[in-house]
Amino acid sequence: MAFKKSLVFAALLLAGCDDTLTLNQVCSETPGFCEDLNKDSHCKDERALLIYARYHEYKSPTDENKYDLLQNLESYNRCVSRAAKIEHIKLKEKTTSRVEGHLTALKEMTRIYNETKGSNHPGLLYYHWSRNSDSTAMNKLLNMQDDPRVQNDPEIQLFLAEFYAKVDDDKTVDILYRVLELNKRGHTPNPEVYSSLVSIFYKHEKYKHAYTFARVAQLSGVEDIDIIPVTNQLASMGKDLANLDSLAQRTYESIQAGEFVSPRDF
C-alpha cells in the first residue's frame, strides 16, 4: 500500500505546477500516449506514471525528462511483460493489449537510447553503460565523479558503487557511505546499500562492521540479510554483541534522521 501511495504522489509531482492536470486530460490532449498501452487494470499505477512522463518529455524534451521517462518505461515494462504472460481464457484482447504495451515500452526505450547517445546526463550515461555496454558512456560518468550532480545524487552514487564493486572494495565502501550521508530524514536507503556493505566487510573478515550493518539493515526492515554467519564468527571469537547492537541502533537513528556521517575510522 505504501508503494502505491508513493506512486500516486510521484504522479502528482509529474503533473508539475499545473495541479489541475489529470490523466484524463493528458489522454484527451495526447491520446497516442495512452492508446498504445494496456487497456485493463494491470499495472495501473505504472501506466499512469508512464503517461505523465511521456507527456512531460513531449512538452519539454530535456535530458532530465528523458531520463525520467526511461525509468518509467522500464518500470512499466517490467510489470506489463509479466502481466502479458497471464492468459485470459475469455478475454483474449486483454492479453493482446498487454503485449502491445510491452512492445510500446521497448520501442520507446530504443528511441530514448538513440536520442541520448551524446548526453552528459549522469543517469543516462549509466543507463547507456549498464543496458548497452557503452564503455564510452561509463568513462564519461567516471570522469564526472566530482561533479555536484554526481556527488549529491544518491541514485547515481549507488550506480557508481555497483560499478566499483567489481574492482575496488575500498572505493565501493566509501561510495556506499556517501549514499547513506545523502539519505534524507525519514527515508529508508536502498536495501542494496546494506547488503553490499555486509558482504564486503564479511569478505574482508571485518566481522564487527558486517554485524553492525546487518543489524542496521534489520532495523530498517530489510528481511533478506543473513546475519547468522557473522554472528557465529563473532561468537566464536568471544565478542560481546551488546555494544555492537547499541552502535547499530545509533547508526540506524542517524541514517533515519538524515544525519549520518561517514565513519572514516570505523
Please provide the spans of the model-predicted regions.
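N-terminal Sec/ER secretory leader and immediately downstream segment
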Residues: T20-P122
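Alpha-helical adaptor scaffolds
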Residues: P122-Y202
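Alpha-helical positions within canonical tetratricopeptide repeat
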Residues: T136, K171-D174, H209, N243, ...
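Boundary/linker segments of alpha-helical solenoid repeat arrays
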Residues: N152-I156, K184-V193, Q218-T231, E259-P263
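Terminal, low-structured helical/coil segments at or just beyond the last alpha-helical repeat
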Residues: D226-F266
